[in-house]
């Protein structure tokens, strides 16, 4: 059944997209100059880099063809728009406007000029980011999760591609469409049992109790497990359990396989002297140390990409997040006071741009003059390298 054939659903979606509900941008398609398609997803979802004409600001417009939406997807979108209306936090991606344009739902957000954390490790930090950069990023994520959990929701999709970084180095958590309320009939439930829809892309990050789908269910502590997996993803340059069949992944997690940070304290010394292709792959830790690239310099023997040492505080932080028993995991508020974050001395907006060098925000490719078309072309070219189809605003 097409979306427009379902009048009740159409009216419900439209009610969430009235201008008084979302913030500051005009809810009119003519106000946006669509520059380039930078991502496509399921259900005819299209992400377009755009310019908001009244101010010249770059924005991201997510366009969803409502005629192609299934009824299940309509329900999914209604939940996402409801949460977007409900939440207001400096570390959660805000909607600037949502509205219906012809047969499409348009959702407008500020453009994140550094892209996602996944973009960064995929293009510049293939062997992982610095510990301090990760501390700043995860602090922003945990602040967002602490708010979400206090609002009675479970996020269920914490991963690097849902961590966005703005031009000024601010960290935002996205992926709100996967959020699930733990409130039922006015009461907060001790556990929920719903398995995330469209979850195939988030399986490596899901906790054992979510994957197990048993009568015990899961709660907000499942997000903490995902934070631990994301910490490994940012530090190692790839997510644990990557490309592992779902059944094997479940068995590894249920049997207590715990991913870790890859450095001199977790990799045997003899492996650090081998080329990555000879290193032993440990399921759950990394698919293959060959994922790291060697960097020879001046003809010298190449060093192993994981010949580094993370602090004991960082290792302990990850261990706390990845405990098999969810009751043993700290909550987001407690983790924000973990010793791992003591190294943070400045605001993320002041420190992250320096820590992410030589990466520059994409808006820096824009010319100084508004009619500099070469600057626009450079911006569009660099946008095409981003994996924005994974950004779920």
UniProtKB/Swiss-Prot annotation:
Q: Can the keyword Cell cycle be found in this entry's annotation?
A: yes
What domain of life is recorded for the organism?
Eukaryota
Tissue distribution is: Expressed in liver.
Q: Where in the cell is it found?
A: Nucleus; Cytoplasm
Which residues belong to any copy of the Protein kinase domain? 32-341
- Which keywords appear in this protein's UniProt record, sorted alphabetically? Cell cycle, Cytoplasm, Nucleus, Phosphoprotein
Q: Which GO terms describe its cellular component?
A: cytoplasm; intracellular protein-containing complex; nucleus; protein-containing complex; serine/threonine protein kinase complex
Q: Name one GO biological process term.
A: protein export from nucleus
Carries keyword Iron?
no
Q: Which Pfam families match?
A: Pkinase
InterPro entries cross-referenced by the UniProt entry = Kinase-like_dom_sf (IPR011009), Prot_kinase_dom (IPR000719), STRAD_A/B-like (IPR047173)
Modified residues annotated as Phosphothreonine in this record: 381
Residues that the record marks as modified (Phosphoserine) are 2, 9
Q: Which Gene3D superfamilies match?
A: Phosphorylase Kinase, domain 1 (3.30.200.20), Transferase(Phosphotransferase) domain 1 (1.10.510.10)
> MF terms per GO, please?
ATP binding; kinase binding; protein kinase activator activity; protein serine/threonine kinase activator activity; protein-containing complex binding
The record ties this protein, via PROSITE patterns, to: PROTEIN_KINASE_DOM (PS50011)
Enumerate the SUPFAM superfamilies for this protein. Answer: Protein kinase-like (PK-like)
Function description = Pseudokinase which, in complex with CAB39/MO25 (CAB39/MO25alpha or CAB39L/MO25beta), binds to and activates STK11/LKB1. Adopts a closed conformation typical of active protein kinases and binds STK11/LKB1 as a pseudosubstrate, promoting conformational change of STK11/LKB1 in an active conformation.
On assembly, the entry states: Component of a trimeric complex composed of STK11/LKB1, STRAD (STRADA or STRADB) and CAB39/MO25 (CAB39/MO25alpha or CAB39L/MO25beta): the complex tethers STK11/LKB1 in the cytoplasm and stimulates its catalytic activity.
The family line of this record is: Belongs to the protein kinase superfamily. STE Ser/Thr protein kinase family. STE20 subfamily.
Please provide the record's free-text comment about the domains of this protein. Answer: The protein kinase domain is predicted to be catalytically inactive.
| Name of this protein | STE20-related kinase adapter protein alpha
Name the source organism: Rattus norvegicus
Gene that this sequence comes from: Strada
């Amino acid at each position: 059944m097409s979306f427009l054939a379902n009048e009740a659903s159409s009216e419900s979606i439209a009610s969430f997209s009235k201008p008084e509900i979302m913030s500051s941008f005009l809810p009119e398609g003519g106000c946006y100059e669509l520059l380039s398609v930078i991502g496509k997803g399921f259900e005819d979802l299209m992400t377009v880099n755009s310019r908001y004409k009244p101010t010249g600001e770059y924005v991201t417009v997510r366009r969803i063809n409502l005629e192609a939406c299934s009824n299940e997807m309509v329900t999914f979108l209604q939940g996402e728009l409801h949460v977007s209306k409900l939440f207001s936090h400096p570390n959660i991606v805000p909607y600037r406007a949502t509205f219906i344009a012809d047969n499409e739902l348009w959702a407008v957000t500020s453009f994140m000029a550094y892209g996602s954390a996944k973009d960064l490790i995929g293009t510049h930090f293939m062997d992982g980011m610095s510990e301090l950069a990760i501390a700043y990023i995860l602090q922003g994520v945990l602040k967002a999760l602490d708010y979400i959990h206090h609002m009675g929701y479970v996020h269920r999709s914490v991963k690097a591609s849902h961590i966005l970084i703005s031009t000024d180095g601010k960290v935002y958590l996205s992926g709100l469409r996967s959020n699930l309320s733990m409130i039922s009939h006015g009461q907060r439930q001790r556990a929920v049992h719903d398995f995330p829809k469209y979850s195939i892309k988030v399986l490596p990050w899901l906790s054992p109790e979510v994957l197990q789908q048993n009568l015990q269910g899961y709660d907000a502590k499942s997000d903490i497990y995902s934070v631990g997996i994301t910490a490994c993803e940012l530090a190692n340059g790839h997510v644990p359990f990557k490309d592992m069949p779902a059944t094997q992944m479940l068995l590894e997690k249920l049997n207590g396989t715990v991913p870790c940070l890859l450095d001199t304290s977790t990799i045997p010394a003899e492996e650090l002297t081998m080329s990555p292709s000879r290193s032993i792959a440990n399921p759950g830790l990394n698919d293959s140390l060959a994922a790291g690239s060697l960097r020879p310099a001046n003809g010298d023997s190449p060093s192993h990409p994981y010949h580094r040492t993370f602090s004991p505080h960082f290792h302990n932080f990850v261990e706390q997040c990845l405990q098999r028993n969810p009751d043993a995991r700290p909550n987001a508020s407690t983790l924000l006071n973990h010793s791992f974050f003591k190294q943070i001395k400045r605001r993320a907006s002041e420190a992250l741009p320096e820590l992410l060098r030589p990466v520059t925000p994409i808006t820096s490719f824009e010319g100084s003059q508004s009619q500099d078309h070469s600057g626009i072309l450079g911006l569009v070219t660099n946008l095409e390298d981003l994996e924005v189809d994974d950004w779920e605003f």
